Amino acid sequence: MPIAADTIKYGPWTMGVRYDLPPEDIGPNGLQDMLNTRLTQSAGIEKVLGTKSYENAAALAGTPTVTACGQFRVPSTGAERVFIVAGAAMYYYNSGWTDITGSVTITAGDDNTFEWVRAFDTLVLTNGVDAPIKWSGTGNAAVLDVDSRFTTADHVAFFDNRVWMANTNADEDRVWYSDAGDPETWGASSFYNLGSPVRGLQPLQNALAIHTEDFIAV
């Protein structure tokens, strides 16, 4: 015969994981421990997928910190290039990781993360610590020519057929832009002063959003 019982409900886990409380003090919306799982934004639980070597490639010597990772398509040839910056070197995958650092200086550091964009057939990267880098998808990487307008830049975007860079070593509130169609020609007056440190650049359809500490300019 049927047994009268209460429904047992699990989640949503809005209380989160409370490692600081004994299990008996945690309500039905809380967790005491988790393993290989994580909470979603809607307070659900999903499995952590973990990591796997790309194409089963051997690990880089010394296990350096990866500060850039992406897939770069060269439109003129259709070539697809998977690249990483790890430690003080840049690599792309070609039946194994091939070092393409060349003469470029890359300062290793856990916080020296790169932003990158594709500008026509050129990959452009910047980390705010070293000179901006370019790579064509073949050969070695090289320093991007910015006509000595600045030395480093924190942020980069590609919009209106121009490369945009912001928060440079000289002016944290300034946004520079290259000539249309030429990522390596930068006019002496090709910049905007925002009056507030720039914290990000994001193309939005027909506009470029410039995020500063105090406002967003479009």
Language model segments and positions:
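Short coil/turn segments at the loop-to-beta-strand junctions that recur within blades
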Residues: 104-110, 147-153, 195
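Hydrophobic or amphipathic alpha-helical targeting/insertion segments
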Residues: 111-146
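A broadly used, surface-exposed interaction patch
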Residues: 96-119
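N-terminal beta-propeller domains
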Residues: 1-98, 151-218
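Beta-propeller fold detector
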Residues: 99-104, 142-147, 187-188
